[in-house]
């Protein structure tokens, strides 16, 4: 395995000593979140979604293309209002109510 110059700084290692550490830390945080595993809204599988363009994402498993955030597939506001998430929460609440009775 070749020597890696980005072991500590992560994806921002490609910038070398340029742009300052603060900006490189921000870039690293964004890119780690962007390239991590996310749940597909269609097939619900946990995969690395492909970013096709600014805010457009595709699931490599099922091929579902959807609009999301610029840097992450689902924004905080979108996650709060996603119908799939609300259905899961309602189902969980119903299970808890039945368990209490």
Curated annotation (Swiss-Prot):
Zinc finger boundaries on the chain: C4-type: 40-62
Pfam families for the chain:
Ribosomal_L37ae
What does the note accompanying the cofactor annotation read? Binds 1 zinc ion per subunit.
Superkingdom of this protein's organism: Archaea
Cross-referenced InterPro entries, in alphabetical order? Ribosomal_eL37/eL43, Ribosomal_eL43, Ribosomal_protein_eL43, Ribosomal_zn-bd
Which BP terms from GO are recorded?
translation
Q: Where does Zn(2+) bind?
A: 40, 43, 59, 62
* Cofactor(s) it depends on: Zn(2+)
CC per GO annotation: ribonucleoprotein complex; ribosome
Q: Identify a single GO molecular function assigned to this protein.
A: large ribosomal subunit rRNA binding
Annotated keywords: Metal-binding, Ribonucleoprotein, Ribosomal protein, RNA-binding, rRNA-binding, Zinc, Zinc-finger
Q: How does it assemble?
A: Part of the 50S ribosomal subunit.
HAMAP family on file:
Ribosomal_eL43 (MF_00327)
Q: What does this protein do?
A: Binds to the 23S rRNA.
Query: What does the sequence similarity comment in the record state about its family?
Result: Belongs to the eukaryotic ribosomal protein eL43 family. Putative zinc-binding subfamily.
Quote the protein name from its UniProt record.
Large ribosomal subunit protein eL43
Q: Which organism is it from?
A: Pyrobaculum aerophilum (strain ATCC 51768 / DSM 7523 / JCM 9630 / CIP 104966 / NBRC 100827 / IM2)
């Amino acid at each position: 395995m070749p020597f890696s110059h980005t072991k500590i700084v992560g994806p921002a290692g490609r910038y070398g000593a340029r742009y300052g550490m603060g900006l490189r830390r921000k870039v690293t945080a964004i890119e780690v979140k962007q390239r991590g595993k996310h749940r597909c809204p269609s097939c619900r599988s946990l995969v690395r979604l492909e970013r096709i363009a600014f805010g457009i994402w595709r699931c490599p498993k099922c091929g579902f293309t959807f609009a999301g955030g610029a840097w992450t597939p689902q924004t905080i506001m979108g996650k709060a209002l996603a119908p799939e998430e609300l259905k899961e929460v309602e189902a969980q609440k119903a299970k808890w109510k039945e368990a209490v009775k």
